[in-house]
């Protein structure tokens, strides 16, 4: 993340806030997690004052996950259990995954981007996507897979003119990208 124009690290699950989406989603908790904006803090160092990425989950998630982390159950350093080395995180995931994974589970993806300029004016975009019942495709598969497919399509069609190694924000024409996702039912809407 960027704070005062400088890359900064903060603890995961910190700076909890509420973000509200239209029904049926409603209020979600937003909190810091790692990796979401990848190299952007270094690319925009000194150019952007503040840049944050927060994960969204249903209310109560942080209250459950903080003690799990504080107890060391997410640590990756092996510990000895009955003479065998065990990675706490691996054990935790193996133990809870079967209880959290439901065959009838239907996911959703909720995303919001808020931008504010030096002049105080801003813009915001929102994406809400749901499990595709007809095709049996999760919202996460739709939003990630279609995004990659659309980017590849735009490259093949010559709509991405930039060559070489670039980040998507540098290379992919935003309006075309949003329109192509919309054709596939993944709608990014500008909020007013």
Could you tell me what each predicted segment is?
Residues 1-192:
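C-terminal catalytic/substrate-binding lobe primarily of soluble NAD(P)-dependent oxidoreductases
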């Amino acid at each position: 993340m960027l704070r005062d124009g400088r890359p900064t690290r903060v603890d995961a699950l910190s700076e909890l806030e509420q973000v509200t989406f239209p029904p049926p989603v409603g209020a979600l908790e937003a909190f810091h997690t790692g990796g979401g904006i990848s190299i952007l803090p270094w690319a925009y160092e000194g150019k952007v004052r503040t840049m944050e990425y927060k994960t969204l989950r249903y209310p109560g998630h942080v209250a459950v996950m903080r003690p799990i982390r504080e107890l060391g159950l997410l640590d990756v350093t092996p510990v000895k259990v009955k003479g065998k080395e065990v990675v706490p995180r691996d054990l935790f995931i193996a133990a809870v995954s079967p209880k959290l994974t439901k065959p009838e589970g239907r996911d959703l993806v909720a995303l919001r981007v808020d931008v504010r300029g030096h002049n105080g004016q801003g813009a915001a975009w929102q994406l809400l996507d749901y499990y595709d019942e007809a095709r049996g495709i999760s919202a996460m598969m739709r939003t990630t897979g279609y995004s990659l497919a659309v980017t590849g399509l735009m490259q093949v069609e010559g709509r991405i003119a930039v060559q070489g190694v670039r980040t998507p924000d540098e290379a992919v024409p935003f309006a075309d990208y949003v329109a192509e996702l919309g054709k596939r039912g993944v709608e990014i809407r500008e909020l007013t």
